[in-house]
Amino acid sequence: MAAGRLRILFLLLLSLHLGLGWVLDLQEAPAADELSSGKMAETGRTWKPHQGNNNVRLPRALPGLCRLWSLTLPVAELGLGYASEEKIIFRYCAGSCPQEVRTQHSLVLARLRGQGRAHGRPCCQPTSYADVTFLDDHHHWQQLPQLSAAACGCGG
């Protein structure tokens, strides 16, 4: 436990020293497996870029491209009717999709959009899913198949 806290403190100090301006957020952030320690997900702690206004000039960030994000939620907040005090990590996809995706489908779709015959833009969506398992209030294991996104990509 102390080693985990020390690692978090080290990462925080290093990021501030490098001018990255990252802070710890307990609600919404990029998936924890993007960090060096996968144990962040177990505690519900994830990282996201600092958005406050302090005197540190932040480096210009890349546009928010399609990627995996995570939220730590109580099972009851899923709205699926399960009674449980457990918290789960719900992963989802969000971000923008570049127009340069080069598949036959995307090339034809881009041409049709240019002619006004097709609508919409490529969207960020899960390319694979993961099952989520939790213990309900009656001490029974519940498995929710394909509840959480496992990988993201641009489609459409």
UniProtKB/Swiss-Prot annotation:
Expressed at low levels in substantia nigra. Cochlea. One of its GO terms (cellular component) is extracellular space. Disulfide bonds join 66-124, 93-152, 97-154. Keywords: Disulfide bond, Growth factor, Secreted, Signal. It comes from the Eukaryota. GO terms for molecular function: glial cell-derived neurotrophic factor receptor binding; growth factor activity; receptor tyrosine kinase binding. One of its GO terms (biological process) is peripheral nervous system development. Pfam families: TGF_beta. It is found in: Secreted. Residues 1-21 form the signal peptide. Belongs to the TGF-beta family. GDNF subfamily. Homodimer; disulfide-linked. Interacts with GFRA4 coreceptor and RET: forms a 2:2:2 ternary complex composed of PSPN ligand, GFRA4 and RET receptor. This is Persephin. It comes from Rattus norvegicus (Rat).
